[in-house]
């Protein structure tokens, strides 16, 4: 995003494989400063061209002295930019400047008490003792020349170090993790106190810049957008429509695997509310015919993905003069793939590969944003809360929440039970606290008694998790009285259900979805 980089101070984060690397960039953006995550292989020249105010080295699972250790372009240290090494990043800096890194006697994982020994700029106005989050198997045992010890812990004599003359800093713990009680303040001290950044990254500025960028890119040509009703595609559609109006056409495919009222809600919001040109395709019978008798989850995903492509292709071929395809690719998608997205699309991010003869120029206005930023953007654009805060929903829809073969009866059970769950969670005021919640049909039946009669009906599973980004998740502690209301309502209001179970498994070992 070239325009933004020129207008805003930027902090570059180099990725050395930490599970927390995205959190670092997100924390910095929360401060109102733009930040990007880049592979550790980026060159010093490439960084110089971005004109950042500072660099952060992330943590990682490797040992700096081990086979396959990840390194960076040594010329990065010659750029004269402030550098902040976190965990592996500190060890890499130590090795680079002639210090010593060794394996610890035991791996340290969890909370530790940090004692500040030297109040460098990194620890300005922070308490002398604070709880931090450790996750490492190696230690810095010898400081490089010119460095001093900033902080220690019981198991880590050099938990923080600095060479303030060269603006080089390192910590053995993870300030980006919320368990580090003053971690945000420490990162702020680096961003503002050391690098001298100014706030300026916000959604209002983003919208202004992105609207102009879309207009310049598209000109008088036309754009096609696959609208699912999910957060990402909804925000993309509204943003582009705000920029170019009727030059945008959306295709909404109703595959019959949507949640209760979802298809009607999409049309009402976008066709009537935003006055957008939306083509609705009723393809329920087409999808159900293809899924008949299929039980394997991967095969179901493949069939749904492929059929979506064929339906989209059929509709797109009826439209003339479509030059661009709008896609809701997020920054996390680019980071996790490790490569930038190609300029000409042959595969759609959300639905699988489009036919090879369908060539579009790609527009990805969200590809510098994280999910939480997309929600903020959606609110700024005036999209209703029920869409902006909509639960994450998989592309195959309810097709992977019905375990085994999909039938209309099973879909109806999941659709109705899920609607009750959502209604009660919202009533209880828990909808913003729980990251994701839904019902699933595991395909098992059990004996029950209803109205003095024996029943042999389906079991419905409830899944609710708390998470920051979906990479890890914990099962949500929904109050018992709320669970009871949900259970009673589902059993009484949804036909062919006589038992409710609650999934109390975290991710890992389980995934959030059941299929």
UniProtKB/Swiss-Prot annotation:
A single MF term (Gene Ontology): ATP binding
Note the Gene3D superfamilies from the entry.
3.30.300.10, 3.40.50.880, HUPs
InterPro entries given for it? Class_I_gatase-like, GATASE, GMP_synth_C, GMP_synth_GATase, GMP_synthase, GMPS_ATP_PPase_dom, NAD/GMP_synthase, Rossmann-like_a/b/a_fold
Active-site residues are 87, 174, 176
Q: In its keyword annotation, does this UniProt entry include Membrane?
A: no
CDD domains reported for this sequence: GATase1_GMP_Synthase, GMP_synthase_C
- Can you give the residue ranges of the GMPS ATP-PPase domain? 201-390
One GO biological-process annotation of the entry reads:
GMP biosynthetic process
> What binding partners and quaternary form does the record give?
Homodimer.
Cited HAMAP family: GMP_synthase
Any idea what job this protein has?
Catalyzes the synthesis of GMP from XMP.
Q: What is this protein called?
A: GMP synthase [glutamine-hydrolyzing]
Q: Which organism is it from?
A: Bacillus cereus (strain ATCC 14579 / DSM 31 / CCUG 7414 / JCM 2152 / NBRC 15305 / NCIMB 9373 / NCTC 2599 / NRRL B-3711)
Gene symbol here is: guaA
């Amino acid at each position: 995003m070239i325009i933004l980089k020129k207008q805003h101070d930027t902090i570059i984060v180099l990725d050395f494989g930490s599970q927390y690397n995205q959190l670092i960039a997100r924390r910095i953006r929360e401060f109102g400063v733009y930040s990007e995550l880049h592979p550790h292989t980026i060159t010093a020249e490439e960084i110089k061209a971005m004109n950042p105010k500072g660099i952060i080295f992330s943590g990682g699972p490797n040992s700096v002295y081990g086979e396959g250790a990840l390194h960076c372009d040594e010329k990065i240290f010659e750029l004269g930019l402030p550098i902040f090494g976190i965990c592996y990043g500190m060890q890499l800096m130590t090795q680079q400047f002639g210090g010593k890194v060794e394996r610890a006697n035991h791996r340290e994982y969890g909370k530790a008490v940090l004692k500040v020994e030297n109040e460098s700029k990194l620890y300005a106005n922070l308490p002398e003792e604070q709880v931090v989050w450790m996750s490492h198997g190696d230690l810095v045992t010898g400081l490089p020349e010119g460095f001093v010890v900033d902080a220690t812990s019981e198991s880590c004599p050099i938990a923080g170090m600095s060479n303030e003359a060269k603006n080089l800093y390192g910590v053995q713990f993870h300030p980006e993790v919320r368990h580090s009680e003053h971690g945000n303040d420490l990162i702020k001290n680096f961003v503002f106190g050391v690098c001298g950044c100014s706030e300026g990254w916000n959604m209002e500025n983003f919208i202004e810049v992105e609207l102009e960028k879309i207009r310049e890119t598209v000109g008088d040509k036309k754009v096609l957008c696959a609208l699912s009703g999910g957060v990402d595609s909804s925000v993309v559609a509204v943003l582009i429509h705000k920029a170019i109006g009727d030059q945008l056409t959306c295709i909404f495919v109703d595959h019959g695997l949507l949640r209760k009222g979802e298809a009607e809600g999409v049309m009402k919001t976008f066709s009537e509310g935003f006055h957008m040109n939306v083509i609705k395709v009723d393809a329920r019978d087409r999808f159900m015919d293809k899924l008949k008798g299929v039980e394997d989850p991967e095969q179901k995903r493949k069939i749904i993905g492929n059929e979506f492509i064929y339906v989209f292709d059929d509709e797109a071929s009826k439209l003339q003069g479509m030059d661009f395809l709008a896609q809701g690719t997020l920054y996390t998608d680019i980071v996790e793939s490790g490569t930038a997205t190609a300029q000409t699309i042959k595969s759609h991010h959300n639905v699988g590969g489009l036919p090879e003869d369908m060539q579009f120029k790609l527009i990805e206005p969200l590809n510098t944003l994280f999910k939480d930023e997309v929600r903020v953007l959606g609110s700024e654009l005036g999209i209703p809360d029920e869409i902006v805060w909509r639960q994450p929903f998989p592309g195959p829809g309810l097709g992977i929440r019905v375990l085994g073969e999909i039938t209309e009866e099973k879909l109806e059970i999941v659709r109705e039970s899920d609607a009750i769950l959502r209604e009660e969670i919202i009533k209880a005021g828990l909808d913003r606290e729980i990251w994701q919640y839904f019902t699933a049909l595991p395909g098992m039946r059990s004996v029950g008694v209803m109205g003095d009669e024996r029943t042999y009906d389906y079991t419905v599973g409830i899944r609710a998790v708390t998470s920051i980004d979906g990479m890890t998740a914990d099962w949500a502690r929904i109050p018992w009285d709320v669970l009871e209301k949900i259970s009673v309502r589902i059993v009484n209001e949804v036909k062919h259900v006589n038992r409710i179970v609650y999934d109390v498994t975290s991710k890992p070992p389980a995934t959030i979805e059941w299929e």
